Each structure stands twice: as C-alpha cells, then as structure tokens.
C-alpha cells in the first residue's frame, strides 16, 4: 500500500528535476538552521558568479569557517496539519518529492561546480514517519557509499520514526536536528496537535545518548565509526504562541543542560497560512525579538549565564 501511495505521489507531480529543485528549495526557506545570503543577483552568462544558485545557504563550523550548503526538503508533501507550516496537508501549494538518486545527483553536481561544501536535508512527512526517515537514510547511504561524498551533511531526524532508522542515519550524518517547533507543550497542542513533546524529545534523547556512547567508544577504539560528530540542534518558532522571552530562555537552558545541544535556533513567526488559530502581528514578524533571543542565547552558551540572571540585570 505504501509503495502504491508513493508511486501515486511521483506520478501526480510529473515534474522535471529543476522544477522540483525550485519548489523544494523554496519550501525549505523557513528552516533557520543555516542562513541565506539575501543576495538576488543572477548570473547573466557574461560575468563570473551567480548569487541565485537555488537553495545555497551558509552555516558556520565550530572553528568559525563558513560552509556553503545545499538546503532542500526531500518532499513538501505532508500528512500533518500544523497551523504555522506552509507545507501542511491543507495548504494549496505546489507539491514535489525527490528520489534518493535525484538528491545524490544534485548534491554531487553542485559540489563539482563548487557551489556547495555540504547538504542540509529536511522533509515533510510522506506517507509515514518511518517511510520518510527510510528515504532520508537511503539518500545518505548512497551519498556516502556509492558517490563517496565526504562533505558535511546536516539531516533532520523525523519525530516518530523507528529509532533504528535514526541511528543508522546518525552514523552517516555530521549533524542531526529535531525541531522543537514551539516553546511549550501547550503551544504544540494548540497549533500542531498531530505532534507531541514525547515524539520530539525521545529521538533527541536517543541522539544525545548515542553521541555520549560513541565518544566513549572512540576513546577506546579511535577508528570506530562516528555518530553525529557535529552534535545536534533544534529550532523554535517565536511569536506564534504567547510565551515571553524568559520562558523561552528557560526552555533553551534546559535543552542545553539536559540534551547537550550544540545550538538552539529561533525563527520569528511569519503567518504564511492565514489560519484563524494564528495570531495577527501588526508589526509583522518579530525580527528584533528573534535577534535579542540570539544575543541572550549567546550568553547562555558561551558565558554560562542562567535564564534567571536576565531578570536581575539592571542598566
């Protein structure tokens, strides 16, 4: 049944690879685990360079290096109906899905042209979490073993997927992330009732434990395969639910302490659906608030501040 459903998806789309690329790079633009350049200068055939290579964005390595990544979704098909997401099952948007081989082709061709140094791969939920996570694993496996791609790979783990699939992907990826989506369980229940804190935090804990066990193993056997060597991260939408900045910082602090995350990303809420359950923000997306949260987050990560410290700061 799943195979038939997947076949129907691909037949319905009947799109070229470049058409899929245009749809699925645009669909990935709200994932802020890396930054886009913001430049819109297109190559004209007469001059060197092109600022509009689809889906090319930038992330920063632990040593400060800027890494160019191909940021795409595997699919923007989704069985979930998260109110804040432009790709939810009720949204009237163009749909597309890659195959594992298509992503391998794009990644290798972009790499050969020196557009990118790595891949950032996320996805909507096609048919089921297990089905989607298996497709992602197949993609990573082919990139690493068939195409011998040794570049950086950041992949999203799919909440609700079989832990065995997440583990296998973790031995092929450099970084994994699972979006927390919203700061509190109440917010998640209100705007994404198909998701739960349990299905998000369980794989986050699995990845944390896997990293710790792998680090211990590497101390004994240096040639042991590495599991998510660049660590894990997460993302929260800011402004879609009524939490204040102190509450958000408390959540981030707990994530850093309990799950040893490398990074928490904050995404200013943009109402892309006009859903009645979403707030109307007269001033538009809270971009300054997002910026201030990153500043506070920096104090958490690098200066060992605690969230409660912010309530006592005076000028």
What residue ranges belong to the model's regions?
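Short glycine-enriched loops at secondary-structure junctions
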Residues: 72-76, 173-175, 182, 270
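Conserved C-terminal portion of the radical SAM core fold
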Residues: 184, 199-275, 285-308
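Flexible, acidic/Gly-rich N-terminal and inter-domain linker regions that tether
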Residues: 7, 11-77
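Short, acidic/polar
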Residues: 107, 162, 166, 245-252
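Short, surface-exposed basic-aromatic patches at helix termini and helix-loop junctions that form
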Residues: 168-173, 253-257
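Core AdoMet radical
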Residues: 88-103, 110-136, 142-163, 170-219, ...
């Amino acid at each position: 049944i799943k195979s038939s459903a997947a076949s129907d998806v691909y037949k319905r789309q009947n799109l070229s690879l470049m058409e899929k690329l245009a749809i699925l790079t645009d669909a990935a633009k709200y994932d802020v685990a890396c930054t886009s350049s913001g430049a819109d200068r297109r190559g004209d055939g007469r001059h060197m360079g092109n600022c509009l290579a689809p889906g090319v964005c930038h992330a920063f390595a632990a040593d400060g290096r800027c890494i160019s990544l191909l940021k795409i979704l595997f699919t923007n098909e989704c069985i979930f109906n998260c109110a804040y997401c432009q790709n939810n099952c009720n949204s009237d948007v163009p749909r597309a899905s890659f195959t594992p081989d298509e992503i391998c082709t794009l990644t290798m061709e972009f790499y050969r042209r020196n557009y990118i140094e790595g891949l950032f791969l996320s996805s909507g939920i096609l048919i089921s979490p297990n089905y989607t996570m298996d497709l992602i694993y197949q993609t990573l496996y082919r990139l690493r073993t068939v195409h011998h791609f040794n570049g950086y790979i950041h992949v999203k783990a799919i909440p609700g997927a079989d832990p065995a699939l997440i583990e296998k992907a973790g031995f092929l990826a450099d970084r994994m992330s699972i979006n927390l989506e919203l700061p509190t369980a109440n917010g998640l229940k209100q705007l994404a009732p198909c998701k739960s804190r349990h299905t998000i935090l369980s794989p986050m804990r699995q990845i944390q434990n896997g990293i710790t066990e792998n680090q211990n193993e590497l101390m004994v056997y240096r040639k042991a395969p590495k599991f998510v060597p660049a660590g894990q991260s997460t993302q929260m939408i800011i402004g879609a639910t009524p939490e204040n900045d102190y509450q958000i910082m408390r959540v981030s602090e707990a994530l850093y302490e309990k799950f040893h995350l490398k990074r928490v990303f904050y995404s200013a809420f943009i109402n892309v659906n006009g859903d009645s359950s979403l707030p109307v923000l007269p001033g538009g997306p809270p971009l300054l608030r997002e910026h201030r949260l990153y500043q506070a987050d920096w104090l958490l990560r690098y200066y060992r501040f605690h969230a409660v410290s912010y309530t006592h700061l005076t000028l």
